[in-house]
Regions:
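Short alpha-helix
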Residues: 202-217
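A short acidic, Gly/Pro-enriched loop at the edge of an enzyme's catalytic core
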Residues: 74, 135-147
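Conserved SAM/SAH-binding beta-strand->alpha-helix loop
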Residues: 108-110
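A short glycine-rich, Lys/Arg-flanked "PGG" loop and its adjoining helix->strand segment in the class I
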Residues: 161-176
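Short, glycine-/aromatic-enriched active-site segment of Class I SAM-dependent methyltransferases
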Residues: 183-201
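Conserved SAM-binding strand-loop segment of SAM-dependent methyltransferases
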Residues: 123-136
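Conserved alpha-helix/loop element of class I SAM-dependent methyltransferases that forms part
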Residues: 34-77, 88-91, 95
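Conserved SAM-binding loop
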Residues: 115-116
Length: 249
């Protein structure tokens, strides 16, 4: 299937999600009809953390809570890939403080508009949202970032290694990548556009996922957390698992 067709389908789906505010996402909890805040809590977010961010930024589209594993420090620069309405950007902004900076990257205009409004309405001065394609070119300078985070986004890309190479490019030496994503027990036997844009068919087998990270030049790629997705049901004939992965430049 053509990569551009897949990318357009993903943009359309997440554009709708940006407009609807949380009823058309790939999270298992959204599929079950749970509210965005409950879906986020079920994905691993701390309930008190959820209360500390703009409620409009919680759309329940994640499959984990990477900020809690990133060990962010005051004054650091952080980039969130596929930042959506901004939940992880705003959580990171609290961790890095006024001397730090958090940049959210998204390819959908609707999500960017929503995130920027959330930032304006809630007085965030250390965040910025930029439009970009994370496989082609992340709009961030080389060697300028302390940490890259992402939540249930890399599975949506058509070339994972290119996305990981872009992450490595923008990270400083010794910088870390901490991402939450979905992986499978084996490669997809066929591709369905709806399932891909729902974070399923683009999910790699776990070993292939880690190999893509290493192929991009990262060191010490390891799984920090692994949890059942959709209660272990087979999706598209595969068992899907949510993982949080860390690697270092």
């Amino acid at each position: 299937m053509e990569k551009d067709v897949i990318k357009q389908k993903v943009k359309e789906r997440y554009g709708r999600l940006g407009l609807s505010g949380g009823s058309d996402c790939c999270s298992s909890d959204c599929c079950s009809g749970d509210s965005p805040d409950k879906a986020a809590a079920n994905a691993g977010y701390d309930v008190q953390d959820l209360k500390s961010v703009p409620q409009e930024s919680i759309i329940g589209a994640g499959c984990g809570a990477p900020v809690g594993f990133a060990n962010l420090q005051k004054g650091e620069t952080v980039v969130d890939l596929g930042s959506g309405a901004g939940i992880d950007v705003f959580l990171s902004a609290k961790s890095v403080g006024g001397a730090g900076q958090v940049i959210g990257i998204d390819m959908t205009d609707e999500m960017l508009e929503k995130a920027r409004k959330n930032a304006r309405d809630n007085g965030y001065s250390n965040v910025e949202f930029r439009k970009g394609d994370i496989e082609a070119r992340i709009p961030v300078d080389d060697n300028s970032v302390d940490a890259v985070i992402s939540n249930c986004v890399i599975n949506l890309t058509t070339n994972k290694t290119d996305a990981f190479k872009e992450m490595r490019r923008i990270l400083k030496s010794g910088g870390r990548m901490v991402i939450s994503d979905l992986v499978a027990d084996r490669k997809a036997s066929s591709i369905d556009l709806e399932r891909w844009s729902s974070c399923i068919d683009g999910a790699l087998a776990k070993d292939d996922y880690l190999a893509s990270i290493r192929m991009a030049g990262f060191k010490d790629a390891r799984v920090l957390e692994e949890r059942e997705f959709m209660k272990g049901e087979l999706i598209g004939g595969r068992k899907i698992t949510s993982i949080i992965v860390k690697a270092v430049k």
